[in-house]
Amino acid sequence: MDIRQVTETIAMIEEQNFDIRTITMGISLLDCIDPNINRAAEKIYQKITTKAANLVAVGDEIAAELGIPIVNKRVSVTPISLIGAATDATDYVVLAKALDKAAKEIGVDFIGGFSALVQKGYQKGDEILINSIPRALAETDKVCSSVNIGSTKSGINMTAVADMGRIIKETANLSDMGVAKLVVFANAVEDNPFMAGAFHGVGEADVIINVGVSGPGVVKRALEKVRGQSFDVVAETVKKTAFKITRIGQLVGQMASERLGVEFGIVDLSLAPTPAVGDSVARVLEEMGLETVGTHGTTAALALLNDQVKKGGVMACNQVGGLSGAFIPVSEDEGMIAAVQNGSLNLEKLEAMTAICSVGLDMIAIPEDTPAETIAAMIADEAAIGVINMKTTAVRIIPKGKEGDMIEFGGLLGTAPVMRVNGASSVDFISRGGQIPAPIHSFKN
C-alpha cells in the first residue's frame, strides 16, 4: 500500500465523515420459545445478554485499533410474533420490555425484531404483535419494530396495510419517538443491519455479525474532482469509491466476528446519511449537476449512484446483503431537508425516487391530522413499487404537527419538515381489505 492510499483513508475519516454506521449482531430466539410468556421473556433476556455481552466492548476496541468511528452497536432478533405465538398472551409488551432490558444491559443503541411477517395473511401471533406495537414502542426506549406486508412472491396483504395505517396513528398518539422506530416493509430482507427495520431471519445462523457502512461525504468529495466530465467517468468514480468504503466494512465485520466467536454475515452496501453537513446523499446527487435535489434528473442521478455503489461494493466483499443502496431519509439528510424547505422536493418525487433507492418513504413527517386510510394508501403505493420491481421498499412516516412545522428528533434521526399530503380520500380503496395478488413475473417455478 502506498502513502497516497494511506492519506486517502485518513482524509475519508477525518474530513469526509466516513464511518462504520453499525455493527449489528443477529440472534435467533427460536430456542427461547415457551408456552409461558414470562418464561419466554426471561429466556430472551438471558440469551441476548449472553451472546451479545461483549458486542459493545469489541466494537469500541476495533474502532480504537483502526481509527475508524463505529457509530452504532445494535442487535436484531427473530421476529417476536413467532416467539409469542406459542403463548396464550393477548399482547406481547412483556416481550418488548425483555428486549429493552437486555439492550440496556449490554449497552447497544437499538434492538430490532419486534416484528411480524404477514405478506400473505395473519397467523395467531401476527395480529397480537401488530396490536401490541403502539404500547411496546411507548413503554420501551431501544426497541424497534417492523412489519412485512407484501412480497413479490405473495402480493400485498391489504388487510394488514389498513391495520398498519391505524397502528402508525396510534403509535404517534402514544409517544413522540415511537413512529421513528416503526417500519412497514414490502420484500423485507432477513439480514438487514440497519434500524428500524432489522430482524434476524429464520434462515440465518444462530448468531451472526452484519455490518452497515456510511460514506456519502466520501463519494461527494470524489465527484468534486471530476466536475464537468461524462457520466462514464462519474460512474467509474462512484464505483471505485464504493469499493474502498465496502472493503473497510468487510475488515471490521471479519474482525468483529472473529473476536466475538460468531459467524460473519454480510456487509450492507448502503450509503447512509446523517444530519451533519458533508454527510448527505442529496448533496452527492447535486454534485452530479442538479441545482437542487428533487428537480428533473434526480431519479436518474439516484439510479446511477445506487447501481455503481452496488458494483463497487460487490467487488470489495464476497458476502453482501441487507438493503444495499442509497438511503434517502428526509430527516436524517441535511440536503433533503433543505430541498423540502425550498419547495423542490415533495412526496410525489420522493415516491418516484423510491423505485430506485434501497428503502422508501423514510423518516418523512406529515400532518398529524392525516387520516389512517391515507397513511395506509401511502404504504400500499410503496409496497406496489417494491412488489412489481422485485425490490425492498418501506414506509417510516411521522404524523406530527401541521404542514410547514419542523419536527425535532435529535441525534442521528435529525429534523423533519412536515410535508404536504394529497387531501383526496382513499377510504373506499383501503376499506376493501383482502389481498392484491402477486405479479405475473413472480411466477418463476
Curated annotation (Swiss-Prot):
InterPro entries in the cross-refs: UPF0210 (IPR007841)
Matches recorded under PANTHER family: UPF0210 PROTEIN MJ1665 (PTHR37560:SF1), UPF0210 PROTEIN SPR0218 (PTHR37560)
NCBIfam families registered for this protein in UniProt: PRK05313.1 (NF003700)
Family: Belongs to the UPF0210 family.
Recorded superkingdom: Bacteria
Native species: Streptococcus pneumoniae (strain Hungary19A-6)
Protein name per Swiss-Prot or TrEMBL: UPF0210 protein SPH_0352
CDD domains membership: RNR_PFL_like_DUF711
Complex formation: Homodimer.
SUPFAM superfamilies in the record: PFL-like glycyl radical enzymes
Alphabetized HAMAP family for the sequence: UPF0210 (MF_01221)
Top-level taxonomy: Bacteria, Bacillati, Bacillota, Bacilli, Lactobacillales
